[in-house]
Amino acid sequence: MNKLVFCLMGPTASGKTGLACELLTHFPFEIISVDSAMIYRDMNIGTAKPSIHELQRAPHYLIDIKDPVESYSAAQFCTDALSLCAEIIKRGNIPLLVGGTMMYFNALQKGLATLPEADEAVRKRLEEEALSQGWDFLYQKLSQLDPVTAARIHAHDTQRIQRALEVYYLTGSTLSTYLTGPHEQPDYYFVNLALFPEQRSWLHERIAQRFDAMLSEGFIEEVQQLQAKWPIQINLPAMRCVGYRQILEYLAGHYDYETMREKGIAATRQLAKRQLTWLRHWEGALFYDSQNVGFNTDIIAKIREILDNTVSN
């Protein structure tokens, strides 16, 4: 049991946070957040960060660890998460990793690939091509060269599009090949519990309702406060978080409120689609439909069964 790590993964708005808080009442878990948006301070509403009350009941590690103008990589996450896992296990508890940043889960469990260093000449060539042809053209090129990676990143995520194409041009191999290749893996046994709503319409409706709730709770004001406090630019990694980019563009006068709302909801649904793509191909995951009544009871029973078997063995 001293090498057992549970992972609760799933798309945005599938109910991960509420379930994680419930699991803490049944098991000696300590929660590590696996969310590339919740790492940022002052970004609370738009990231659906657990409430103060929830954090008092169920503290989360790796929340509020970076300023919005800072960056954070999958490699940094692995270092932090593995260190926390060791500390939690040393205290006699069990790590529970909760979130939807599938690239972090992948890097943690399968190891990080040794990717080539950035090449200024290749990057300049790609930027010139983007200026002349547009980033949509480069995204389509990536979709042809590496459809697996293209399906996992947003069509407007220029930084990741550029990096994926750069890796291909430098090595002749796709980024997805690197990520799925054999790497040094941590000495833990990961149990992957995946929330996987079968009805996309149910998830889409929840996403729309949650985005509207965020707007009502002051999402726009939160972005304005970020602008007042930090030198916020649209190309910052923090502004890749869904909703923030759309509100920034709305505040800049690029489109009206209703268009911003529609774009924010659409971007969140696209994020959920990419997360589900990761999960669909996740080997050995235990899938639960969070739309079903009693799914949490099924998960609790499975965890108890795994822990009982681990102790008896």
Curated annotation (Swiss-Prot):
Coiled coil: none annotated. Residues 35-38, 159-163, 240-245 are annotated as: Interaction with substrate tRNA. It catalyses: adenosine(37) in tRNA + dimethylallyl diphosphate = N(6)-dimethylallyladenosine(37) in tRNA + diphosphate. Pfam families: IPPT (PF01715). Its EC number is 2.5.1.75. ATP binds at residues 10-17. InterPro entries: Dimethylallyltransferase, IPT, P-loop_NTPase. Its cofactor is Mg(2+). One of its GO terms (biological process) is tRNA modification. One of its GO terms (molecular function) is ATP binding. It is an enzyme of class 2 (transferase). The keyword ATP-binding applies. The record marks 101, 123 as: Interaction with substrate tRNA. Substrate binds at residues 12-17. Keywords: ATP-binding, Magnesium, Nucleotide-binding, Transferase, tRNA processing. Transmembrane segments: none annotated. Belongs to the IPP transferase family. Monomer. Catalyzes the transfer of a dimethylallyl group onto the adenine at position 37 in tRNAs that read codons beginning with uridine, leading to the formation of N6-(dimethylallyl)adenosine (i(6)A). This is tRNA dimethylallyltransferase. It comes from Legionella pneumophila (strain Corby). The lineage of its organism: Bacteria, Pseudomonadati, Pseudomonadota, Gammaproteobacteria, Legionellales. The gene is miaA.
